[in-house]
Amino acid sequence: MKDALIKRFEKQIGGLEHELTHELPKEIQRARELGDLRENAEYHAAKERQRFVEARVSMLKKRVSEIHLMN
């Protein structure tokens, strides 16, 4: 049970980290190229997604760490 949960969380972490390091930077760059960032909905949406993914990765890593500490 514990190992399956860790494996599931680590799979999610891997997917989110891929999005964070490969997909989101491209999205943010494309949105930047559209011009004025103050009124650029695509840019703000990509940055919001980036913050969400960073928070989710952090939470999942914390959970994995907590599971490892359980007996």
Regions found by a protein language model. Give the residues of each.
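N-terminal intrinsically disordered, low-complexity, charge/repeat-rich segments that act as generic
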Residues: 1-70
